[in-house]
Each structure stands twice: as structure tokens, then as C-alpha cells.
Amino acid sequence: SNSLFEEVRPIVNGMDCKLG
């Protein structure tokens, strides 16, 4: 269940880093 969130968190973190 948390697997999906754990797999999506790095993507969101990468996007945030790119935006910042």
C-alpha cells in the first residue's frame, strides 16, 4: 500500500528540486 507512495515521493522530490 505504501509502496506506491514510496515510489512516487522521489519523483515529486525531483520535480520540486527542478522547480526550485
From Swiss-Prot:
It is an enzyme of class 3 (hydrolase). Coiled coil: none annotated. The modification 4-carboxyglutamate is found at residues 6-7. GO terms for cellular component: extracellular region. It is found in: Secreted. Residues 11-20 form the Peptidase S1 domain. The keyword Cytoplasm does not apply. One of its GO terms (biological process) is proteolysis. Gamma-carboxyglutamate residues are formed by vitamin K dependent carboxylation. These residues are essential for the binding of calcium. Transmembrane segments: none annotated. The keyword Flavoprotein does not apply. Expressed by the venom gland. It catalyses: Selective cleavage of Arg-|-Thr and then Arg-|-Ile bonds in prothrombin to form thrombin. Keywords: Blood coagulation cascade activating toxin, Calcium, Disulfide bond, EGF-like domain, Gamma-carboxyglutamic acid, Hemostasis impairing toxin, Hydrolase, Protease, Prothrombin activator, Secreted, Toxin. It comes from the Eukaryota. Heterodimer of a light chain and a heavy chain; disulfide-linked. Is classified in the group D of snake venom prothrombin activators, since it requires the mammalian factor Va for maximal activity for the cleavage of prothrombin. The venom of this species does not contain its own coagulation factor V-like. In contrast to blood coagulation factors that circulate as inactive zymogen in plasma, venom prothrombin activators are always found in the active form in the venom. Belongs to the peptidase S1 family. Snake venom subfamily. This is Venom prothrombin activator notanarin-D. It comes from Notechis scutatus niger.
